[in-house]
């Protein structure tokens, strides 16, 4: 009996002192294609490297992690055949139960949900990214909270110029979002944002978005409505 109690005590002590092991992972995404024309456009062909993401993410344990990512891609500021490097993410994240906080050069929440739901960025960007409704990353803070399995909310405040132009003008970009999952596979995303005018005489830019989609292992379908006011 004494030996059995001793074993139980040692096991319990080992479980109490167990700590989460730090973990890290490399990030590598490459978007490329092979294209060719037909007929009169037959000379327009070849391989194209559209964009690459290189980075590293490290989890220190107890919900604390850091991530750094560089974006290598095209820019309207240089020749089409040249590539330019930007820092896309340099951020710290902390997760505690249902709360998540992010700070630094973070991923924005304006259309991040739609990108993940779509899942085929290598084929086509999401609508808001393609038509410049906002930036996919910016310098600032964000917070999200999962109230229940079917509802979560998030808030963000960033500079508003994106990760390629860090605080060129004054003003902030504020955003609020709600994600609903009424049944498995079916999700609804609502988002509203306000980007403060950086110059006197100009109006604030307002963004509204509504998305709903259904996803199974065999197919994905979705619909999205976006509206932007006072865009220059």
Where are these regions (language model features)?
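Detector for outer-membrane/organellar transmembrane beta-barrel domains
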Residues: 169, 179-232
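Active-site-proximal beta-alpha loop/turn segments in soluble metabolic enzymes
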Residues: 156-165, 195
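Cleavable N-terminal export/targeting peptides
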Residues: 1-19
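A short, polar/proline- and glycine-enriched secondary-structure boundary/capping micro-motif
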Residues: 78, 113-114, 165-166, 199-201, ...
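Flexible, active-site-proximal loop/turn residues at the rims of small-molecule/cofactor binding pockets
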Residues: 60, 161, 225, 229
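Outer membrane beta-barrel
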Residues: 16-37, 41-160, 170-172, 179-186
């Amino acid at each position: 009996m004494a030996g059995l109690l001793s074993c139980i005590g040692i096991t319990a002590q080992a479980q109490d002192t167990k700590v989460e092991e730090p973990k890290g992972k490399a990030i590598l995404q490459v978007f490329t294609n092979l294209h060719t024309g037909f007929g009169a456009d037959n000379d327009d062909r070849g391989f194209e490297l559209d964009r690459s993401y290189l980075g590293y993410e490290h989890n220190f344990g107890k919900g604390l992690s850091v991530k750094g990512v560089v974006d290598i891609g095209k820019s309207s500021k240089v020749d089409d055949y040249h590539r330019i490097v930007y820092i896309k993410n340099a951020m710290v994240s902390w997760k505690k139960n249902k709360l998540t906080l992010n700070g630094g050069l973070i991923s924005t929440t304006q259309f991040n949900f739609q990108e993940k739901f779509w899942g085929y960025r290598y084929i086509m960007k999401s609508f808001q990214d393609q038509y410049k409704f906002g930036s996919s990353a910016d310098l600032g803070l964000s917070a999200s909270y999962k109230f229940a399995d079917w509802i979560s909310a998030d808030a963000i405040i960033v500079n508003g110029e994106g990760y390629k132009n860090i605080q060129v003008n004054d003003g902030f970009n504020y955003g609020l979002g709600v994600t609903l999952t009424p049944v498995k596979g079916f999700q609804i995303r609502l988002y509203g944002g306000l980007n403060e005018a950086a110059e006197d005489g100009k109006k604030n830019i307002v963004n509204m978005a509504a998305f709903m989609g259904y996803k199974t292992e065999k197919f994905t379908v979705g619909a999205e409505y976006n509206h932007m006011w006072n865009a220059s």
